[in-house]
Swiss-Prot record:
The lineage of its organism: Bacteria, Pseudomonadati, Pseudomonadota, Alphaproteobacteria, Rhodobacterales. The keyword Lipid metabolism applies. Belongs to the P-Pant transferase superfamily. AcpS family. GO terms for biological process: fatty acid biosynthetic process. Mg(2+) binds at residues 8, 57. This is Holo-[acyl-carrier-protein] synthase. The gene is acpS.
Length: 137
């Protein structure tokens, strides 16, 4: 069952200007060290940060809170599987909120999709509750 859906659109040029103006202050407030390391290795640094910004916004919407009620930017982190597929990792209050909204007997799965077409970066997040497998009889 679907527990939440969120989407966000971020302007890559705006993120680029914010990075130029605030630098590490912005990076350290919003992005985890892993996200920063990945972004700084990419050819399109601003685009990478913009997609992750959009993913965090979309995730906060899927959690039903937006960026309030104690949720912090770094409670949501985008990583990538070896295949390149993005995955959302939740910690802190975001993880607590996810646990609270997951029905008993289910596990929560956070699906994330990222795309960009300059100057836009877009993210979709779907939170699914999947029934836990019953133990064999």
């Amino acid at each position: 069952m679907i527990l939440g859906i969120g989407t966000d659109l971020a302007n890559i040029e705006r993120v680029e200007k914010t990075l130029a103006r605030f630098g590490d202050r912005f990076r350290n407030r919003v992005f985890t060290p892993l996200e920063q390391a990945r972004a700084e290795r990419r050819a399109d640094v601003a685009g990478t940060y913009a997609k992750r910004w959009a993913a965090k916004e979309a995730c906060s919407k899927a959690l039903g809170t937006g960026l309030r009620m104690g949720i912090a930017w770094k409670d949501m982190s985008v990583a990538n599987l070896v295949t390149g597929q993005p995955v959302m990792e939740l910690t802190g209050w975001a993880a607590e909120r996810l646990a609270a909204m997951t029905p008993p007997g289910h596990e929560a799965i956070v699906h994330v999709s990222l795309t960009d077409d300059h100057p836009w970066a877009q993210a979709f997040v779907v939170i699914e509750a999947r029934p836990l497998a019953a133990p064999p009889a």
